[in-house]
Amino acid sequence: MFRVSNFMVGLANTLVMLVGASAIGYSIYMFVHQGVTDCESAIRIPLLTTGLILFLVSLLGVIGSCFKENLAMVSYLIILFGGIVALMIFSIFLFFVTNKGAGRVVSGRGYKEYRTVDFSTWLNGFVGGKRWVGIRSCLAEANVCDDLSDGRVSQIADAFYHKNLSPIQSGCCKPPSDCNFEFRNATFWIPPSKNETAVAENGDCGTWSNVQTELCFNCNACKAGVLANIREKWRNLLVFNICLLILLITVYSCGCCARRNNRTARKSDSV
């Protein structure tokens, strides 16, 4: 008789196979499609690799549970156990490297501002050296500051100051508040006539440009905004990993039962 545990493992892995096949299909689409941007193309190989791993491991689970192939099931359980351990280690690592990096509240502003020193050294490596050149071009390509240039809010200083900006918009689309620039519109600011102290304390004051393709994309504040965005995504990933761990442990337990069912079925068939 086909056991419940075999059915659960087979069903779960069939669904994961579909996810893996979708990832493979989308990555192939990005390889052959000419309209994909450089930023989007950066995820092609990781997406293809992840899709292949999910598909092949799940295929082992389906073969082992549905066709009662004990070797396939044992191989699947070994890989799954290794994945659970690796995911646990990765989740603990994520918790510690994203523990720092909360934005700084600015008096009279509806947005926060960020500094690279507030983030872990490991996270700062994401925006260091040549990596930043690629990220900066992606930000310009994505037109992250265009939303600030539209509407009445972009023309009124008080309305802009109370706007809830994203970390990237706060760091890349305006000068830091301590530079004391004069607001003209959301992406055009006039430096004060005497700002030597602010420039000395914050190098971003001299880096700001009213050229719309540059703005503060070369500022450390922009790097910090990107780091804040990465930190937020990784904190969300941490929550996802915890849920995934619960699911994988459940599937692993069902897999162990399915393996025992396979052995029992083989003994019954041999009698």
From Swiss-Prot:
One of its GO terms (cellular component) is membrane. Glycans are attached at residues 185, 195. Its main location: membrane. It is found in: Membrane. Belongs to the tetraspanin (TM4SF) family. May be involved in the regulation of cell differentiation. This is Tetraspanin-11. It comes from Arabidopsis thaliana (Mouse-ear cress).
